Each structure stands twice: as structure tokens, then as C-alpha cells.
């Protein structure tokens, strides 16, 4: 079969609109990929990145009797068709076929596939680990064993363009992030081209930088209702889409990006003004990167800090939850989310934030368990009222959220989670719930490992 980039539909190959479960291929969680880097830093292991050439064409077909009309330039006599002998781009089952094929080859090399995250693999004999995102691989382990694994993957899966991060200064690209090895760990940074594209779309190439990404106080005006022109709406959505790719590594802008995302359906002039302020902030912080440098060994391997801003928006009075998950002192996950339910008190909104943090912590601990690393995460909140609800028995006066209260209480009683109090000034998740003044933002961002620009 000829190898062409064009999808099968252009060759007269028809598929049903909706597939089935055999067409769904998984991708690894970004926090789990960051955990691979942190684990390598803790153990002093090497890291290698690479991608497989012609991945889909390597996978055997999961369906039978797939035929295609040859393209006109092939010069095939009319009435003849091609029979597909392998998967190909455009075939719905191709991603799943490649996923299973690559997993089987990795298992032949002695790597066990994770059950919680099927895109992670580990070989306990020499502590070699691998994460696979489609045809891209991130692998860690002792240098000698990792070299052998790269050679084996090159032979079995045609792994190419291998970049080795063995010494400080080595760097490579994985997905849309630049990974660089430094003394004691790694740094992660989004592509600079994304910032350049945003500034170009908004006509801000020569603009001056702002010191904060968003303004806390906004006076109500007609700009709140004035819709953008169709062309400006398209630019708005394109810019916010690029910001969303930068967000996982930039906790300092996640809250602002969340606010911008709410205007995606019908962006207004006010939304555009917010976007331009965010873009000007990126001018002065384009060099900021997230450092993954493990701290001093501690019993608290996994820590989660959560916070909430109660009823912060007058439009719907829904609160905002923020959280940061640390693994060996390194930020592997952070989030800023609108709460789905209205909270009747600040304690209730903080309880919702604890619930979100608990789910993230338990999921991450489950993944670590498959690495034979048994941990009990610790959740920190600055709300004494919410922590009191968790530490007592029964919902008390909060009968309307009984299940949430009882779940947190049960996880604490089963010692699956620990809970602790943190001072408001030291709660790093505070910047994920509301706009911050300059000094406060610099302090919190520096505490979570952001480096470069205004951050130490």
C-alpha cells in the first residue's frame, strides 16, 4: 500500500460518523509526564525523548476487508481497488491499533503497562520508565539501560530523532514544551512562538509590558455588552487557545486564562481588553519557566494546597477553586476552576476546593502505587472551618452537601489522606483563585518554582 499523508476519505474510503470503543486511544496525563521528570531528578536518572517514524503504518489492522479507491495519479485501471494491509492516517481505528501495537512491543522488552494510566510503562528490574503520547516517547532510567532501550525501540518501533537529556544544559522538545536539564532537575517552558503569535494577532509586537496579568477591580461599562466583530472573535479564540497550551506550566496566569475562556462563545470588548492585558504581561515574562527541582527528602511526598474565592463573580455568584499538587516539592499539576454548585458560605466553597484537591491527590497516589511507591497525600487549606468539617463525624448543618462531607471524612478515617492547616500568606494556591497584586504574585510564583523574568 502506498504511504500517503492524505486521509482515507480522499481515496473513496467511507467510515461511519461515530466509532466504537475500539477507536478510542488514550493519552497520558500531563502531571504523570511531569512526575516522570521529577522521579528521574530524584534518582539521578537520565531522560531521553524521541518519536516513531510512520507510527500508524506499523500497526496491524484491527478490522478486516478495508478497501480504497486508488488516487487518479496512481494510474490503476478502472474497477480495481487497493486492499489495506496495515493501519493508516485517516482510519478511525488507527490510533487504537498503534496504541496496542506499541504497548505489546514495550511489554516484550519487559516493561509493564500501567492500569491506571495505560500510556505509562515501568520495568522494575532496572527502574526504567516510559511515557507514550501517540508516537512521542519520554523515557527515564540509568544511562546504560536507557541507551539499550532506545536502541531496542529504534529497531522495533522505528524510534527516531532521539534527544538525550543526560547532563545539565541538554534540552529537547516534547509535545509543545521545551524540556531542559539543569543542576538537580529540569525546567519546562512553552514554545516562544505561541507568545509571538498572540502578540502578532493582537497587534502588540511593540507594546510595553504590564506587571500583572489581570486587574482585580473592573468598573462596569458598556464594554461588558459590546460584542466583537466576527474577525476579532476568531482572533480572540485563537489567542485563548494558545494561552491554554501555555497554562499547564504557568500557574501565575492560570486564573486569568480561566476568566478569558468564559468569553469564548461570545467575546465582548471587555474580554478583548483583558486578553490584551494578558498578552502585554507575557511580553515581560516570556522567559519564565517552571523548575522541577526536588527539595529535601520528606515524609510528605505528595502535597496538595487548595483555596477558594467565595462568590467572586456577581453574574452568577459561583466561587472559584484553585489547587496545586506537589510531588517531592515540585509542581506537577495546578488548576483554577469555577465551582459547579453555588456555595452558601465561604466554608462551603473551601470544602468544595478540598474535594477537588482530594480527587486529584488520590488519583496521583494511585498512579504512584503502580510504580510501587506507596504514599499518603497531605491536603493543606487555610480554612479552619472546612478542616473542622472534615475532622468531625457527620455533615452537621451541611446536610445539603452530605456526600461530599462524608467522603472527605471517610478518606481521612481510612488514612488515605491527611489534612493540615496552612497560613493564608503561605498558601500558594491563592493566586489561582483571584487576581493578585504584583508583590504577592511574585512571592507565590517564586514559591512554586517559576523562574525567570520577575521571579527568582
Map each language-model feature to its residues.
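Long, low-complexity, charge-biased intrinsically disordered regions
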Residues: 1-456
